[in-house]
């Protein structure tokens, strides 16, 4: 098995793509000693194409709850009784202060994230004003995650300083309807393509541990590759009480590590970003940075707590890695 891993690794260094069947073979055969061989190879691929730099980003839940969509994993959906805090669009000062604070702590990217399929025109204008002010007053890269937007809206975001748009595919096309029925996979892809057309970089990934198969995960990784996604966040399902996935069995550690490694093999030049659910991984995902990951969301998530920024920075430095500042 080690020879197969090395052969595929060499293919990637020669700018050849791993095939779907090769990815399946790597995942299914990587146990015990072979697991370490797989993780080591993914780490070398990460180093070859991305160096030892780790990108830290942070997010702000800028509008919480009351979402019309039925995503089975989500605490913010109106379809489920999850007892989360609900509020309308945050104000300028709160967003500006958090962006400043995160920059001072060493964060490279900052994003507003809003609930709902799309923002109202009024809320979208508020978001534009907030981004315009942050861009003027804080030296930090700006990202946005505001749902399904048109090309013109995405162009407006770019014009006020946003450089990257986040919009997850969540899972494979085949499994998607088991997770969401209120909007389509193609609507998500259209938003991604509109963002690229507007000149924005794109951050798009998914959630693992929702009952999908290994094949679904690998199909997602190849879909992201076909879309030339620059930043791929991998979330681990943190089952929320009141949602349909409340009683879903949590993934084993090795399953998470293998998934990250395979995503690195399939997308060697992308940023593989640890996202929600890091608290379910040993040491807040420390081992993932030896399995191909080279980016992470630091601080709190949307409705759950994350790792402290200073703790993340210490962890990254302890691994001999550097921060992208």
Swiss-Prot record:
Gene3D superfamilies: Aldolase class I. SMART domains: BATS, Elp3. Its cofactor is [4Fe-4S] cluster; [2Fe-2S] cluster. It is an enzyme of class 2 (transferase). It catalyses: (4R,5S)-dethiobiotin + (sulfur carrier)-SH + 2 reduced [2Fe-2S]-[ferredoxin] + 2 S-adenosyl-L-methionine = (sulfur carrier)-H + biotin + 2 5'-deoxyadenosine + 2 L-methionine + 2 oxidized [2Fe-2S]-[ferredoxin]. GO terms for molecular function: 2 iron, 2 sulfur cluster binding; 4 iron, 4 sulfur cluster binding; biotin synthase activity; iron ion binding. CDD domains: Radical_SAM (cd01335). Keywords: 2Fe-2S, 4Fe-4S, Biotin biosynthesis, Iron, Iron-sulfur, Metal-binding, S-adenosyl-L-methionine, Transferase. InterPro entries: Aldolase_TIM, BATS_dom, Biotin_synth/BioAB, Biotin_synthase, Elp3/MiaA/NifB-like_rSAM, rSAM. GO terms for biological process: biotin biosynthetic process. Its EC number is 2.8.1.6. Binds 1 [4Fe-4S] cluster. The cluster is coordinated with 3 cysteines and an exchangeable S-adenosyl-L-methionine. Binds 1 [2Fe-2S] cluster. The cluster is coordinated with 3 cysteines and 1 arginine. [2Fe-2S] cluster binds at residues 111, 143, 203, 273. Disulfide bonds: none annotated. Pathway: Cofactor biosynthesis; biotin biosynthesis; biotin from 7,8-diaminononanoate: step 2/2. Catalyzes the conversion of dethiobiotin (DTB) to biotin by the insertion of a sulfur atom into dethiobiotin via a radical-based mechanism. Homodimer. Belongs to the radical SAM superfamily. Biotin synthase family. This is Biotin synthase.
């Amino acid at each position: 098995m080690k020879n197969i891993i090395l052969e595929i690794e060499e293919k990637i260094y020669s700018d050849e793509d791993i095939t779907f069947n090769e990815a399946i073979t790597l995942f299914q055969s990587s146990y015990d000693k072979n697991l370490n061989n797989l993780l080591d190879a993914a780490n070398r691929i990460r180093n070859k194409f991305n160096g030892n730099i780790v990108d830290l980003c942070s997010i702000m839940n800028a509008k919480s709850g009351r979402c019309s969509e039925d995503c089975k994993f989500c605490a913010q959906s109106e379809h489920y009784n999850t007892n989360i805090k609900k509020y309308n669009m945050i104000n300028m000062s709160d967003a500006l202060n958090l962006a400043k604070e995160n920059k001072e702590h060493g964060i490279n990217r900052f994003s507003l994230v809003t609930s709902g399929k799309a923002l109202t025109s009024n809320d979208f204008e508020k978001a534009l004003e907030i981004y315009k002010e942050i861009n003027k007053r804080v030296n930090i890269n700006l990202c946005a995650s505001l749902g399904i937007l048109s090309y013109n809206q995405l162009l407006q975001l770019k014009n006020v300083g946003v450089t990257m748009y986040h919009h997850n595919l969540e899972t494979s096309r085949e499994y998607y309807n088991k997770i969401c029925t209120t909007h389509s996979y193609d609507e998500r892809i259209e938003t991604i393509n509109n963002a690229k057309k507007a000149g924005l970089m794109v951050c798009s990934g998914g959630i693992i541990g929702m009952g999908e198969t290994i094949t679904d995960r690998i199909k997602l990784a190849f879909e992201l590759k076909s879309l030339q996604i620059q930043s791929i966040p991998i979330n681990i399902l943190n089952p929320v009480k009141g949602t349909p996935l409340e009683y879903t069995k949590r993934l084993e550690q090795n399953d998470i590590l293998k998934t990250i490694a395979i995503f690195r093999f399939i997308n060697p030049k992308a940023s593989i970003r640890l996202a929600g659910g890091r608290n379910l991984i040993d040491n807040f995902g420390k081992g993932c940075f030896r399995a191909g990951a080279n980016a992470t969301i630091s601080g709190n998530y949307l409705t759950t707590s994350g790792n402290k920024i200073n703790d993340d920075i210490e962890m990254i430095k302890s691994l001999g890695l550097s921060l992208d500042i």
